[in-house]
């Protein structure tokens, strides 16, 4: 993937990865501002990258049906796509368009406690029905608000 534009989120993600006590990350922001592109570029620093998009791949909406533990979630993902490789401490999992799957927020606590996989969620969060969310994993996730290109980032682009 060719990536030419430096964004502030790039520095944030590098520091996040280096934190030995990192929590699952939720990157929020408006549509079409580069969230997914920035995350995919960052994912190149991992040996294994698992991308789950709940809008373009609705078959993944059921991955939380047998529970929220990493073992259950990974098992369900692997049943859908057996080619995905989940290697502890070498894998980044992206749950993209999480607003389409309210239960996604619940699993973050369990991924944090487990600690073997880095997890990033992304989405506009417009229209999410919080009444459908079992738990939002308060204290077990970190939020980052990404904005559209600002003037400093524009100057970096030259």
Regions found by a protein language model. Name each.
Residues 1-158:
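Phosphate-binding site recognition
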